[in-house]
Amino acid sequence: MIELDRDAMTPMYVQLANVLRDRIRRGEIPVGRRLPSQSELEEETGGVVSRRTIKSALEVLADEGLVQGVQGKGVFVIALPAGGQS
């Protein structure tokens, strides 16, 4: 389950990107593995975020060079965050 704080000053998409980045950093989602789909992430958050919010979080990770979308396949981890696994 992904827990996000609706009342936090940090936008929901940033909170979600942070959670996913941490999972990548810890090796829970290793390089080469597909991230959960948007519908799976929506379910993991208990439906508190929209698909647009999820897409924005994935765009943040893509802009950081951590993930890449593959048409018809999903979004895959392509690199570790700075600092690697902890």
Which residues fall in each region the model found?
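Extreme N-terminal segment that seeds HTH/winged-HTH DNA-binding domains in transcriptional regulators
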Residues: 1-52, 56-68, 73, 79-86
